[in-house]
Amino acid sequence: MTGRAAAPEFLPIVLALTTRDKGRELLRRAFTRRRTKLLLVRTAEAAGATLRTTLVDAVVVDLCAGGDDAWAVAALARQLPSIPFFALVAPRLADAAVLGRSAALEVTDLLIEGVDDAALRELVVPQAFTARFAAALRGAHAPLGLEAPLQQRAWEYVVSAGGRPVRTDAIARALDVTREHLSRSFATSGAPNLKRVIDLVRLIAAAELAKNPGYDLADVATVLGFASPSHLANTAYRVAGIRTASLTRLRTRDLLTRFCQGRSRSRV
């Protein structure tokens, strides 16, 4: 077994609305298939449907052509504050009016076409939902008693998924160990079971998304890949002893505390 870090297999998902060929070409060059999953849509309806069914890491709205749909999608930034929204504008549009309207809609940043082209990915991806989620939880393994190198590497892999479903065999492959060795070694010295930890991280992501006005609990269950809202409810009770309605007010610290109070072990 090596000491290298796990290699996450989760590409950031960027949703982009544009009606221009030039806009699509620019976005495809910036967010290549090898490094990003780019979802291109042309209408506000399609963007809204995607946001309700997929855990999107960032949204880029092409304002260069204007139009009601573009501003309608930009307005979703206030409804989904966990997801960063970026406005792609031409230099001639980067005036006080556009800046003021974008700021009022709580758009994360402006991307200037022709100026920021080569740096679009570097400007967007570090602020993506999954990147910020993983960074916020990177040190949260300590209260769980995950101090061994293998435990920490597995933890980093799990949080890198941003709350998406994670299989133990995928973690084992990334860490270059067998699934049996991983499960056995992870839960040593009273540490929680790996499967339970995966559920905890998914519940923390659900709590983050549930605080967004634009999501109801059914939406949260869908975007995080739970089989149904009932599946999310069962996970919330099993992991933290709570009802899903409590997710809108509980912080990560609260969920970690409840998890450590006797709910960190599962049958395997």
Task: For each feature predicted by the language model, list its residue ranges.
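Conserved phosphotransfer microenvironments
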Residues: 57-85, 89-98
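Conserved acidic segment of CheY-like receiver
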Residues: 9-22, 27-31, 39-40, 47, ...
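Basic/polar phosphate-binding segments, predominantly the helix-turn-helix DNA-binding elements
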Residues: 169-196, 223-243
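Basic, amphipathic alpha-helical hairpins
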Residues: 153-167, 186, 190, 207-216, ...
